[in-house]
Amino acid sequence: MKAAVVVFPGSNCDKDTFYVLKYVMGFDCYYVFHKDHFYEKEFDLIVLPGGFSYGDYLRAGAIARFSPVMRSVSKAAENGVLIVGICNGFQILTEAGLLPGVLMKNKDLRFHCHDVYLRVDNNKTPFTLAYSEGEVIKMNIAHGEGNYYFDHCKEIEDKIVLRYCDRNGNITEDSNPNGSVLNIAGIVSKNGNVFGLMPHPERCSEKLLGSDNGKKIFESVALYLERRKDHAFA
């Protein structure tokens, strides 16, 4: 399984993501830089990591969406390649129109860096197959613009994957760190192959770091790709 980690000027979670994909998960992993182009089916998985691409000028992800590499990312998305946007990567995917909605400044206008509880509301995506529906997990967030908003929430109800919750899985206002509509922490695209989330699974993929709850996202991808491969040769 071949994976790419896209690096923009200002990315700062690319090495963490690369490490998890290559050394924890065993993916054949490569860095792809903002000026690069690639064949749309060259990779099985493309990850846009966290950071502050182009200094978050204008707004988070607004400049990165115009990087040359995003033309290749968009073509890959059209061809069904699995794409994950983590934090700033999620912001870039919304700016590029690959995911619906927008990420705005946190409701309290503060930068949040701490662990949160999340409820897996949809375990039927390529990114959540290893979780149970309704499972409560813990991951780290680190963002100032994670307040997700979309005008027509009913249109994406079945695309909501992760929601902020309390330790018991209750969706409450107090458990929402940034003001996101419906406590949304992660969503998938209409076709289901593009996933954006504000929490950082790469920071929660080894027990040494206090939690390996995020590892199941990458395990789910590996499981999905194996099943797709087996189906193709059946």
Swiss-Prot record:
Please verify whether the record's keywords include Ligase: yes
Pathway involvement?
A: Purine metabolism; IMP biosynthesis via de novo pathway; 5-amino-1-(5-phospho-D-ribosyl)imidazole from N(2)-formyl-N(1)-(5-phospho-D-ribosyl)glycinamide: step 1/2
Task: Enumerate the active-site residues.
Answer: C87 (nucleophile), H200, E202
Subcellular location per UniProt equals: Cytoplasm
What cellular component GO annotations does this protein have? cytoplasm
What is the catalytic activity of this protein?
A: N(2)-formyl-N(1)-(5-phospho-beta-D-ribosyl)glycinamide + L-glutamine + ATP + H2O = 2-formamido-N(1)-(5-O-phospho-beta-D-ribosyl)acetamidine + L-glutamate + ADP + phosphate + H(+); L-glutamine + H2O = L-glutamate + NH4(+)
The EC code for this enzyme is 6.3.5.3, 3.5.1.2
Q: Which GO terms describe its molecular function?
A: ATP binding; glutaminase activity; phosphoribosylformylglycinamidine synthase activity
Taking every annotated instance into account, which residue ranges of this chain make up the domain Glutamine amidotransferase type-1? 3-231
Major location category of this protein: cytoplasm
- GO BP annotation list: 'de novo' IMP biosynthetic process
Q: Does the keyword Transmembrane apply?
A: no
Keyword terms, alphabetized: ATP-binding, Cytoplasm, Glutamine amidotransferase, Hydrolase, Ligase, Nucleotide-binding, Purine biosynthesis
Q: What does this protein do?
A: Part of the phosphoribosylformylglycinamidine synthase complex involved in the purines biosynthetic pathway. Catalyzes the ATP-dependent conversion of formylglycinamide ribonucleotide (FGAR) and glutamine to yield formylglycinamidine ribonucleotide (FGAM) and glutamate. The FGAM synthase complex is composed of three subunits. PurQ produces an ammonia molecule by converting glutamine to glutamate. PurL transfers the ammonia molecule to FGAR to form FGAM in an ATP-dependent manner.
Recorded hits in NCBIfam families, A to Z, give:
FGAM_synth_I (TIGR01737), PRK03619.1 (NF002957)
The name under which this protein is listed is Phosphoribosylformylglycinamidine synthase subunit PurQ
